[in-house]
Amino acid sequence: MNYIDLLKTSAKKTNNCACMGLDPIFEAIPNKTGMLKDNLVSFFKELFDTMHEKNLVPAAFKPNIGYYSALDKPREKDFSGSESLAEILSLIEKHFPGIPVILDSKRGDIARSSLNYAIEAFDGWKADAVTVSPYMGSDSILPFISEKYLDKGAYILNRTSNPGAKDFQNLKTDSEGKNNSELYIEVAKKIAFYAKEFPGTGAVVGATGMEELKIISGIYAQAGEVPMLIPGVGSQGGDAKTVMEVLKNSGCNLALIRINSSSALTHPWKKAPVPENYLELCINNIEKLLSETAINGISF
C-alpha cells in the first residue's frame, strides 16, 4: 500500500479528513507523576483511551519532532522527549491501527543529508510521511519520495500558516514583470509536477490564508492526486468549516486532505492553569474538529 492508498483507506475508515497535532508543551500538561516522560505518556494514554472509547478517530496524527527533541539532554544521557515520542507512537499504533503518522520535522538539505533525514523519519520513527522544506531544490526533496521510500509521503512546504510566511512565499518571481506569479504558486506547480512521478508527494498549505488556499487547491485539483496537509486551524485562527468549503469548491479529493489542529486539541487552556475538566475540554474540541471535517458521501 502506498501513501495515497493509506490516505484514502484511513479517510474512508474514519469518515473525516482531520489530523490531530501532537505538540505538547510540558508546562501545560497535567502533572500527575512529577516525571517528564511519565507525564507526557500518561496524558496521551488517557486521551487516546477516551478517544478510543468514544470512537473518535482522526484520519492522521502529526507530532512535531521539535517539541520532543527539545526535552532531550543528550550530553546528560537524558532522552526523555524522544522516548516519550516513541511510546506515544506505539500508543497510536495500538489504539488507532491503520491511521497515518506524519512526522513534522521540516527537513531539507543536500542529497546525502536529506537521505539521512529520510532514514530518521521512515526507518527510525516508522513514520508514514514527513514534512520537507523545498528551499534547496529537487535534490533535497527526492530522497524523501523516490527509490526505497516511494510508498511514503512527503509534504513540501508550499504556503505556510505562520505570520512570516509572506516574507518569502508571496514574493513575485520575476522582477522584469514578465511573470508576476508569487513564489508559492511556482512551488505549487513544482509539487504538482513531482506528484505525477512520485505518488505521495504533497503540500503543506496553511488554513490562515484563504486566497492562497483557493489558488493552490485549484492547481492541485487539476493536477490529480496531490495530498495536502493544512495546519493553522484553532489556536492560529484558521477555521475548519471555511477550509472545507474552499476545498469542496476547488474540486479537491477530500480523502487526500488532512486538516490539522494541535494545541486546541491537546491543551486548549493554553497558559492558564490546567483545569479539572481538562480531558472533557480536549475531547469536546476533538469531536468538533472531526465533525467539521466529515467527508460523507465522497468518492474514494
What are these regions (language model features)?
Residues 11-13, 48-57, 87-96, 144-151, ...:
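Acidic (Asp/Glu)-rich catalytic clusters
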Residues 14-18, 56-59, 97-99, 126-128, ...:
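Short, well-ordered coil/turn segments that N-cap beta-strands
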Residues 25-26, 31, 109-204:
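Conserved anion-binding
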Residues 70-91, 110-114, 135-150, 208-219, ...:
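Active-site-adjacent beta->alpha loops and helix N-cap segments on the catalytic face
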